[in-house]
């Protein structure tokens, strides 16, 4: 049996299994209807250990969970732990927004996915996982990129939103739309060994994201998981805490009387710590939830709120075409026996990236260190004794972004004239030239 037929048969078996579970559920409901139980007998067994916890409110609390609709924006490092716990707890409808696909580099932290699903849409992979976990729930997927045009249509009808995204732009959009629709948001982020979590727009009286952050961080201060890395269990713990906070919201643990805005900070290394800080409430001058707000549904949908312009973006395209070379051109000069005699080969990735995998001929000077030299040639010569103003310098980084910035530094600050960066960087070289080099 070939792979195609095997995959087809597996899908058919999965569909039959789900259909069987749904039929059993319908039968159980009919059998229980005469007794007027709010849950099926199987649901009593499934959620029993949860219902006997006094704080959940017993059967009434479980019915609340069953009647609640939660939207999870992002099925990555935060969404992956949050989704199965929400499904396992019995949240009746779960929506998943994500247009990304599963990649091998995701799997160390996004443990809801697995190796067999590489290339599959994350929202579909998540749907398959949580419907296997709990066939009593309804799961809706949105394989689209969230934007000003579709956010209102996607959000409406949901009681709570989990913001599991990794960019300030999307966080502002999620918060703005939620405020306009009167939806409470559980928002979190994580990077490296740390994470943070908060609740926004609680019952339309709590602060929104703009109350906390009226202006976004500068683009060069924002680091993604791809750039900064992340420890799986650390972000997983934050995602699990998001599920806890969502259950507390649904079960009425938080009330208008006892809720106080907070920011929870988690750090996994060197010793684990969890701190909670009291945050300020709604701000009267907030453009989204304040008295004279201008960020309305109409303004967002018409595109009058330019999130890209507001949050900014790092401009990496700072080199002229003749200051860049392709990986093919680099390969030709790299294979020249006199390469090192004619060129200085500089790798500007962070040192711990360089240690994972590098060209043996490359000298590692992270771009941060180059910046700190502030154009001082003597400081550069301490690292590169052979470098002179007329040296031919070839610069490499991970993706071909920092190498452009380094090219500008060496030309504009240090006064070098013969500097070129490798377009696409180290990873482009691996993809196009030599797949035997480790790619991380």
From Swiss-Prot:
Pathway in which this enzyme or protein is active: tRNA modification; 5-methoxycarbonylmethyl-2-thiouridine-tRNA biosynthesis
Residues found modified as Phosphoserine: 326
UniProt main location, coarse: cytoplasm
Localisation: Cytoplasm, Cytosol
EC number per UniProt: 2.7.7.-, 2.8.1.-
Ranges where the Rhodanese domain occurs: 339-438
Class of this enzyme: transferase
Textual note on the cofactor: Binds 1 zinc ion per subunit.
Top-level taxonomic group: Eukaryota
A Pfam match: Rhodanese
Binding sites annotated in the UniProt record for ATP: 77, 98, 105-109, 122, 166-167
GO BP annotation list: protein urmylation; tRNA wobble position uridine thiolation
Binding residue positions for Zn(2+): 208, 211, 286, 289
Gene Ontology MF annotations: adenylyltransferase activity; ATP binding; metal ion binding; thiosulfate-cyanide sulfurtransferase activity; URM1 activating enzyme activity
Catalytic site positions: 225, 397
HAMAP family assigned to the protein according to its UniProt record, in alphabetical order: MOCS3_Uba4 (MF_03049)
Protein name listed in UniProt: Adenylyltransferase and sulfurtransferase UBA4
């Amino acid at each position: 049996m070939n792979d195609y037929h095997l995959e087809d048969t597996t899908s058919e078996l999965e569909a039959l299994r789900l259909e069987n579970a749904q039929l059993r559920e319908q039968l159980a409901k009919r059998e229980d209807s005469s007794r007027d139980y709010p849950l099926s007998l199987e649901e009593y067994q499934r959620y029993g250990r949860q219902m006997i916890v006094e704080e959940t409110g017993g059967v009434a609390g479980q019915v609340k969970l069953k009647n609640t609709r939660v939207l999870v924006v992002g099925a990555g490092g935060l969404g992956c732990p949050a989704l199965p716990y929400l499904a396992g707890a019995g949240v009746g409808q779960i929506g998943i927004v994500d247009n990304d696909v599963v990649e091998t580099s995701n799997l160390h932290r996004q443990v809801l996915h697995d190796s067999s699903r590489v290339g599959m849409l994350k929202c579909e992979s998540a749907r398959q996982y949580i419907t296997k976990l709990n066939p009593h729930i309804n799961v809706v997927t949105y394989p689209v990129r969230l934007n000003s045009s579709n956010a209102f249509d996607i959000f409406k009808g949901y009681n709570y939103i989990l913001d599991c995204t990794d960019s300030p732009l999307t966080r502002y959009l999620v918060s703005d739309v939620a405020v306009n629709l009167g939806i409470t948001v559980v928002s979190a982020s994580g990077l490296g060994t740390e994470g943070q979590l908060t609740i926004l727009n609680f019952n339309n009286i709590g602060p929104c994201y703009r109350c906390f952050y009226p202006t976004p961080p500068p683009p060069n201060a924002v680091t993604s998981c791809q750039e900064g890395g992340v420890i799986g269990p650390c972000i997983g713990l934050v995602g699990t805490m998001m599920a806890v906070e969502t259950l507390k919201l649904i079960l009425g643990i938080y009330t208008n009387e006892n809720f106080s805005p907070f920011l929870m900070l988690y750090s996994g290394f060197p010793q684990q710590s969890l701190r909670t800080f009291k945050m300020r409430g709604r701000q009267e001058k907030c453009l989204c939830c304040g008295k004279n707000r201008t960020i309305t549904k109409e303004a967002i949908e018409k595109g009058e709120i330019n999130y890209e312009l507001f949050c900014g973006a790092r401009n990496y395209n700072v080199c002229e075409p003749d200051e860049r070379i392709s990986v093919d051109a680099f390969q030709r000069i790299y294979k020249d026996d006199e390469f090192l005699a004619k060129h200085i080969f500089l790798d500007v990735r962070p040192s711990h990236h360089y240690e994972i995998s590098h060209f043996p001929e490359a000298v590692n000077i992270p771009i941060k260190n180059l910046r700190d030299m502030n154009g001082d040639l003597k400081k550069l010569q301490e690292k590169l004794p052979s470098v002179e103003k007329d040296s031919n310098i070839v610069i490499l980084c991970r993706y071909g972004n920092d190498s452009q910035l380094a090219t500008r530094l060496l030309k504009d600050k240090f006064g070098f004239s013969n500097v070129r960066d490798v377009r696409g960087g180290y990873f482009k070289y691996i993809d196009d030239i030599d797949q035997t080099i480790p790619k991380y």
